[in-house]
């Protein structure tokens, strides 16, 4: 797996950027210069690609301890694949930053200058002063306000290899391509269409037990206002329109450091429940509001590639505007779950809970949907005609054909002449076209590109 290292002097926002990219609070962040002195690592996803993100200690010659940190940072940088050098956009460039940057540039690796804390027009004007670093790749960010990250991700994506996010997916696809005959319909795995497994997840005290009780219309789980009352996962089934929906009520996920004893076991059990679920109800507290822990749990759902419905519970107590809230979730907090429907309910009063049952059936139908190969290829043909594939350094890029090779979740292979040239933005365009035509609401859609006549996903 390729690695991305964040380097810079203390207090430029490395840990904040690390947490933002990792979608969870791992590194300690504060306004005190030099809070992070140890190297932190975590695996991240940038679009359809994986990478190891490394948060280095701050570089500062003025502190004896930091001399060792700098030495270790440079060592890690030599072993990394991509370097992001952070500076503080509130301050003018200094020679020390330039020296650090030039020493890293000599390593011959992809390197970008990231100017953080660019929060307003005045900061943008000041950022021009960093042009004398002599680097083409400069990105203005405001990590605090989540501004500028999309451009940075787009640049990083160019240097990352295509990897599947689902375990063993590589082997599954290669086995499929070995025996698949172009133009033929594929015999999919059998999925029980009459039994749906639904995991209910969320942080502590968002109302998961109350929601379960409302869904099955009986007091099955112990409901209390005390945070973390439900410890043991509880299964309950309900028949809706001749379909058996099996619900699992999970223990709430607490913040790190507060997980003790049975609660720690329950967190591990939540992972297991998701691994055996097909659809997740991600429950949020619309009265209390959302936080970074909600994002972490959402990331857990995305990691398992489940169908998902975002449930805004306690809506009767909320003062939020529904449309603005949905926009915030899809464009900011949960960009990676933008395909998920959002439903507001009040579990205690039972208001709008019935809507969830119909929506679960619909999402499950999308989750197990089979696209006819001829219809899929007609769509791809029309999409590429409307917006032709960009050339790859002057060479023509072609999609020979497309085929769905799995379901639950749906997975589509694009057989191409130059699969590595398929930019993530064009892949996203194709995903949007497929979603629009075949209705994949609430469902992750996996698209893989492969070279025709080869098991390799490159041009060699």
From Swiss-Prot:
The keyword GTP-binding appears for this protein: yes
Lineage: superkingdom: Bacteria
SUPFAM superfamilies in UniProt: P-loop containing nucleoside triphosphate hydrolases
Domain called EngA-type G: residue spans: 2-164, 196-368
InterPro entries: G_ENGA (IPR031166), GTP-bd (IPR006073), GTPase_Der (IPR016484), KH_dom-like (IPR032859), KH_dom-like_a/b (IPR015946), P-loop_NTPase (IPR027417), Small_GTP-bd (IPR005225)
Amino-acid positions noted as binding GTP 1 in the UniProt annotation, renumbered to this chain: 8-15, 55-59, 116-119
Keywords carried by this UniProt record: GTP-binding, Nucleotide-binding, Repeat, Ribosome biogenesis
Pfam families attached to this UniProt entry: KH_dom-like, MMR_HSR1
GO terms classed as biological process: ribosome biogenesis
Record-level Gene Ontology MF annotations: GTP binding; ribosome binding
Protein residues bound to GTP 2: 202-209, 249-253, 313-316
Domain KH-like, chain residue ranges per copy: 369-453
Quaternary state and interactors: Associates with the 50S ribosomal subunit.
HAMAP family cross-referenced by the UniProt entry: GTPase_Der
Assigned protein family: Belongs to the TRAFAC class TrmE-Era-EngA-EngB-Septin-like GTPase superfamily. EngA (Der) GTPase family.
Function noted in UniProt: GTPase that plays an essential role in the late steps of ribosome biogenesis.
Protein name per UniProt: GTPase Der
Natural source organism: Campylobacter jejuni subsp. jejuni serotype O:2 (strain ATCC 700819 / NCTC 11168)
């Amino acid at each position: 797996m390729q690695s991305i290292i964040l380097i810079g002097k203390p207090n430029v926002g490395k840990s904040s950027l690390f947490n933002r990219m990792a979608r969870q609070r791992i590194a300690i962040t504060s306004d005190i210069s030099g809070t992070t002195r140890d190297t932190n690592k975590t695996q991240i996803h940038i679009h359809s690609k994986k990478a190891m993100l490394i948060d280095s200690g701050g570089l500062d010659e003025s502190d004896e301890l930091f001399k060792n940190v700098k030495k270790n940072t440079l060592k890690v940088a030599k072993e990394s694949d991509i370097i992001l050098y952070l500076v503080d956009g509130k301050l003018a460039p200094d020679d020390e930053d330039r020296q650090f940057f030039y020493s890293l540039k000599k390593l011959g690796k992809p390197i970008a200058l990231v100017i953080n804390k660019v929060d307003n027009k005045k900061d943008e004007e000041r950022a021009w002063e960093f042009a004398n670093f002599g680097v083409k790749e400069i990105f203005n960010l405001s990590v605090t306000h989540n501004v500028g990250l999309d451009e940075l991700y787009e640049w990083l994506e160019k240097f990352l290899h295509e990897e599947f996010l689902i375990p063993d997916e590589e082997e599954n696809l290669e086995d499929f391509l070995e025996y698949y005959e172009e133009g033929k319909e594929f015999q999919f795995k059998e999925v029980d269409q009459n039994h749906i497994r639904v995991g209910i997840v969320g942080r502590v005290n968002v109302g998961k037990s109350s929601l379960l009780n409302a869904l099955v219309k009986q007091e099955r789980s112990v409901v209390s206002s005390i945070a973390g009352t439900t410890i043991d996962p509880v299964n309950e089934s309900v028949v809706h329109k001749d379909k058996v929906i099996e619900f699992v009520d999970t223990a709430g996920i607490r913040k790190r450091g507060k997980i003790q004893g049975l609660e720690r076991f329950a967190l591990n059990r939540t992972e297991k429940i998701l691994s055996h679920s097909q659809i997740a109800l991600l429950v949020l507290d619309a009265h209390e509001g959302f936080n970074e822990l909600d994002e972490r749990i959402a990331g857990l759902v995305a990691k398992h590639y489940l169908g998902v419905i975002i449930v805004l519970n306690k809506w009767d107590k909320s003062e939020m505007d529904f449309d603005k809230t949905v926009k915030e979730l899809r464009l900011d907090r949960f960009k990676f779950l933008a395909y998920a429907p959002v439903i507001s309910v009040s579990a205690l009063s039972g208001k709008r809970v019935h809507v969830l049952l119909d929506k679960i059936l619909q999402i499950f139908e999308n989750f197990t949907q089979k696209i006819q190969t001829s219809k899929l290829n007609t769509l791809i043909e029309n999409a590429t005609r409307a917006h032709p594939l960009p050339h790859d350094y002057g060479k023509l890029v072609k999609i020979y054909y497309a085929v769905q090779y799995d379901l639950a979740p749906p997975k589509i292979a694009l057989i191409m002449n130059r699969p590595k040239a398929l930019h993530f933005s064009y892949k996203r365009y194709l995903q949007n076209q497929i979603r629009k035509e075949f209705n994949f609401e609430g469902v992750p859609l996996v698209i893989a590109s492969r070279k025709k006549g080869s098991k390799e996903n490159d041009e060699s």
